[in-house]
Amino acid sequence: MPGAALLFSAIWLDVPHVVQPERGCGAASVAMVMQYWARRVPIASPPLAEIHRALYSESTKGTPASRVLALFEKHGFHAFAFEGRQQDLEEQLRQGRPVIVARKPRGSDPHYSVLTGIVSERVYVNDPALGKDIPVDGGRFEREWAAAGRWMLIAVPRQEQ
C-alpha cells in the first residue's frame, strides 16, 4: 500500500546499540543482534572489527546480504532474509526477535538498521549511525523500507529454536 502508514500496537525489545565503522552499518547491525542473543543464550558474539572484515565488500562498497546470512550461520544462528510485510515485523518482535531491516532514505544508499520496537504509528530502530531506539514515523519507515525492497532478516540461535 504505497503511502499507507504503519499501525502497530506497543512492542519494544532492549537491543544493545553498536556504532558503525565507516560503511559498516551491516556489521554494526549484525553485532547488535548477536549481542542481544548473547544476553539470553550461551553464544559468542565476535568483535565488531571481525564482523566488518567478514562482511564488507570493497567492490560494492557495502555489505551484501549473502555475507550477512553466511556469517550468522557460521556463528551458530539460523538466519532468514526475505521481502517482508508489516505483519511480519510485528510478529517477529512479539516473539522477542529483533529484525534487521534495509531502508533507503531518499537520495541515499540502502542502510541497515535494527528494528527494536513499534508503538502506535511509530517504529523504533537502533540506527548504527544515529543511535539507540530512534523513533521513525510509520509512513516514513514504510517508504524507506519499500524503497529497499522491504528486505528484512531474522537471526535466531540454533539452540533457541
Residue ranges and their predicted role:
Residues 2-11:
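Hydrophobic alpha-helical targeting segments used for export or membrane insertion
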Residues 25:
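Active-site-proximal loop/helix segment associated with metal-binding centers of metalloenzymes
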Residues 10-16, 34-36, 46-160:
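Conserved active-site-adjacent core of cysteine acyl-enzyme catalytic domains
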Residues 21:
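Beta-rich catalytic cores
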Residues 40-44:
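Structural helix-adjacent loops and short alpha-helical linkers that scaffold large soluble proteins
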Residues 1-2, 161:
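Short intrinsically disordered terminal tails
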